[in-house]
Amino acid sequence: LLGYGADPTPDLTAELDRIQRDRVRRARQMVDLIEAETGVSLDLSVGPGIGRPHIARAVAESSAPYDYAGAFGRLIGGEGPCYVPREITDAETGIALLRESCGLVSLAHPFRYRDPEAALEICAELDAVERYYAYDHPMDPAPVEHAIERYDLLPTGGSDAHDQRLGVAGLDSADWERVASRLPGAER
């Protein structure tokens, strides 16, 4: 889930803190597993904000026999020996927390879920869906377009930094204006 125009409540702050602690715990476990699996010491500082892309880059820059894609595919992807699952906030809790503190709540990258169609059903309770996202494989946008029409959603754009550059997938100015007009303090 994505929350836009946030004015964090204490409950949201507490949940974000828990997520960040889990993110660091998970990264530390994956780094430990990779180092044990490969016999290579990774040059990586594990702290807030770390994710698998950072770990994959560190693997690619090490003497381990994996490039960035190989680190995901062979080590830290969902089936990899060094993968550690996240403790994910359930959708109901996440939606409630974001509704209390955000002007706009959006479903993030719907094609990254095991069942994209089921994920898009959550949009019935949301304001928007991430229509533009830099997926690593071609996707048919029709299911997202259908959800946008069916639930009268705003399209949002991806901002994840999974590549070496930002701004790969985003909104055009007209779509951005529609999103911005729904945010707190918008004077349009």
Label the model's feature ranges:
Residues 1-119:
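Extended substrate/RNA-proximal surfaces in nucleic-acid metabolism proteins
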Residues 1-7, 89, 96-102, 107, ...:
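Charged catalytic cores and adjacent phosphate/nucleic-acid-binding surfaces used
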